[in-house]
Amino acid sequence: MTTLTVQQIACVYAWLAQLFSRELDDEQLTQIASAQMAEWFSLLKSEPPLTAAVNGLENSIATLTVRDDARLELAADFCGLFLMTDKQAALPYASAYKQDEQEIKRLLVEAGMETSGNFNEPADHLAIYLELLSHLHFSLGEGTVPARRIDGLRQKTLTALREWLPEFAARCRQYDSFGFYAALSQLLLVLVECDYQKR
């Protein structure tokens, strides 16, 4: 990636972590359709590999704004995709895709982080990976820890995530009939791939 700063990438990861961690409330629903978010999406589209994914997300948001009971419908989508059994869902856990659920715990320890008691999900939840990536990108921007160490940990985290994120995104596309979370997962998939290639 060339046009986005490490802080901006950190913000994108933090934003995605928030959206994948819990159902959207009314305030978040208003925010994603705001002029401020439109500016943010324009900035993201300045990064060519992200353009199509951001356009897809904007289209799903535009459709969302005219949907009756949008928040309730989106909550039902969230529940159906991320909280049910894996038969017709896209469970947001590394272990659901036959990955080592202990890997994220090792990465968190290496980064000097731990999961919050406020987040009542297993440590291998997608949002934890994204929070870790956000933290690492912010750390790169601060310059207080050697960049080589942070970058090595960032690469390990991206490698672990790339093991199961494509299947997760495919399941979102397959089972999210409305398409908001499918579009969100596609943006995440492209972002992670771009970030990984940036080595």
From Swiss-Prot:
BP GO terms, sorted: protein complex oligomerization; protein folding
Main localization (coarse): cytoplasm
NCBIfam families: PRK04976.1
Annotated compartments: Cytoplasm
Keyword line: Chaperone, Cytoplasm
Provenance organism: Escherichia coli O45:K1 (strain S88 / ExPEC)
Keyword NAD in record: no
Family: Belongs to the TorD/DmsD family. TorD subfamily.
Protein name: Chaperone protein TorD
Lineage per the UniProt record: Bacteria, Pseudomonadati, Pseudomonadota, Gammaproteobacteria, Enterobacterales
Pfam families, per database record: Nitrate_red_del
Function: Involved in the biogenesis of TorA. Acts on TorA before the insertion of the molybdenum cofactor and, as a result, probably favors a conformation of the apoenzyme that is competent for acquiring the cofactor.
GO cellular component, as recorded: cytoplasm
Listed InterPro entries: Chaperone_TorD (IPR023069), DMSO/NO3_reduct_chaperone (IPR020945), HscB_C_sf (IPR036386), TorD-like_sf (IPR036411), TorD/DmsD_chaperones (IPR050289)
